[in-house]
């Protein structure tokens, strides 16, 4: 890792982190004025970055991971900015698979803090996400990365990341999410996501239906060429012992690739990633077929369709909206149908609880309802009542913490059972930390 700052005025890591977390109270406040001003005061570190910008409802993180891994296999230095984190804040800001160090983080905060405090004095405080975005851009600039993978936080048009002019914009797929903020219709949400499209910058998109028309119209207005990805462009050819093989149709040739990321929908994510790097190739980047194949094979994404334990078999997936839960259920039906399924479910209360519950219950043999430590976590009794209202013959338990839920699941699981932890990334993050702690 590079060292970004060596300054006697650098504050201790914990003080820096506590200061940053104090801004979580501001929540999401849309608009680019604050992040633009903040970055200007910091010398506009984002303007020198070669960015791949990724938006969408589901699959953003996986696509970012695939592209980052491909570029690294080709010998490039790659920054990766993702959100939210699963276990540690440092997961959000990564260069070549190395999370930002405590020293670098504290040094960056020491630089950003005076600017932010001055903005607060003017009643113009940036949000938590805006500050983190500025930290990521600074870190990538200081470390002179060749490319920066930047994942949209929420929406697109007014997201803090939308100050970049990327080499390529990727929109994975679009379904209902954050409807209180983005709108109640897919078309409205698509319009927000399409806000990342820039004049003359190529777009790679996997959206369908109403969203496709909206994105196509915006791209046409901005003279941005679009590569559309649909299900005819990839086929799953095999699944064996946690590995999938896909045949993916690229712009120039077909690719046979393998991935340890689970779920048939990874075919779409891989097709999006390949289409994006093909755009970079058309812009002059040198990549070999092996770079693409080896990069996809090496990519991992903790907490998303992740097998974290073999005995007992435990699957973690941060599905937190109806579309994501449907993908999880399809994977359970297709690849784990011979196993009894013990589901540990913890969801945030501002999600579409009824649809999420009604989607996961049919595949479940036993359901253990719990909650994460996040203050937005739904009350388990509310989820229990929803399951009862479905009038299905399921065994349901309630535990007041994720460690207790995991211990309970392990006690009742049979040798060939699958334990599936899902409902939110906060639930999965706590579960992952606890399971790894036990294993170590």
Regions found by a protein language model. Name each.
Residues 208-218, 223, 313-316, 322, ...:
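C-terminal helical cap/extension that packs against the catalytic core
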Residues 1-26:
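Charged, amphipathic alpha-helical linker segments immediately N-terminal to NTP-binding catalytic cores
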Residues 82-84, 205-207, 218-240, 259-264, ...:
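Beta-strand->loop->alpha-helix junctions that form or flank phosphate-binding loops
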Residues 12, 26, 32, 36-49, ...:
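ATP-dependent carboxylate-amine ligase catalytic core
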Residues 138-141, 275-282, 433:
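Short glycine/serine- and small hydrophobic-enriched flexible loop segments
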Residues 54, 62-79:
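A conserved segment at the C-terminal end of the G1
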Residues 132-181, 212, 216-256:
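Extended acidic/charged loop-beta regions that coordinate divalent cations
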Residues 48, 147-152, 159-170, 174-178, ...:
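Nucleotide phosphate-binding/pyrophosphate-handling subdomain across enzymes
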């Amino acid at each position: 890792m590079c060292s970004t700052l060596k300054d006697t005025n650098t504050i201790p890591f914990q003080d820096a982190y506590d200061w940053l977390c104090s801004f979580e109270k501001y929540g999401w406040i849309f608009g680019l004025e604050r992040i633009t001003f903040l970055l200007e005061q910091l010398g506009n570190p984002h303007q020198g970055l070669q960015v791949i910008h990724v938006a969408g409802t589901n699959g953003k993180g996986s696509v970012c991971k695939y592209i980052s891994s491909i570029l690294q296999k080709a010998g490039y230095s790659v920054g990766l900015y993702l959100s939210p984190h699963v276990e540690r804040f440092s997961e959000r800001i990564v260069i070549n698979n190395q999370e930002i160090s405590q020293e670098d983080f504290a040094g960056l905060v020491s630089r950003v803090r005076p600017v932010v405090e001055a903005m607060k004095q003017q009643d113009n405080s940036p949000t938590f996400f805006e500050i983190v975005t500025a930290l990521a851009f600074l870190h990538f600039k200081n470390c002179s990365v060749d490319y920066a993978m930047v994942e949209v936080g929420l929406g697109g048009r007014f997201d803090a990341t939308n100050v970049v002019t990327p080499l390529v914009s990727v929109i994975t797929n679009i379904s209902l999410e954050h409807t209180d903020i983005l709108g109640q219709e897919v078309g409205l949400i698509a319009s927000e996501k399409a806000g990342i499209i820039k004049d003359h910058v190529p777009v790679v998109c996997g959206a369908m239906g109403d969203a496709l028309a909206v994105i196509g119209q915006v791209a046409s207005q901005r003279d941005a060429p679009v590569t559309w990805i649909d299900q005819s462009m990839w086929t799953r050819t095999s699944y064996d012992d946690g590995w999938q093989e896909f045949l993916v149709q690229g712009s120039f040739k077909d690719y046979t690739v393998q991935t340890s990321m689970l779920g048939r929908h990874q075919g779409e994510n891989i097709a999006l990633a390949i289409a994006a790097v093909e755009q970079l190739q058309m812009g002059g980047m040198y990549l070999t077929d092996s770079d693409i194949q080896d990069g996809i094979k090496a990519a991992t994404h903790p907490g998303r369709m992740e097998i974290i334990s073999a005995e007992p078999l435990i699957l973690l997936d941060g599905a937190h909206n109806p579309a994501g839960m449907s993908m999880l259920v399809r994977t359970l039906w297709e690849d784990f149908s011979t196993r009894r399924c013990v589901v540990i479910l913890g969801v945030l209360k501002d999600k579409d609880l009824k649809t999420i519950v009604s989607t996961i219950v049919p595949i479940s043999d036993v359901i253990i309802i719990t909650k994460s430590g996040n203050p937005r976590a739904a009350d388990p009794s509310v989820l229990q009542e929803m399951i009862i209202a479905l009038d299905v013959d399921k065994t349901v338990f309630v535990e007041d913490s994720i460690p207790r839920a995991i211990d309970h699941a392990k006690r009742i699981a049979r040798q060939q059972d699958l334990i599936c932890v899902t409902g939110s990334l906060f639930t999965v993050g706590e579960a992952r930390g606890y399971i790894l702690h036990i294993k170590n």
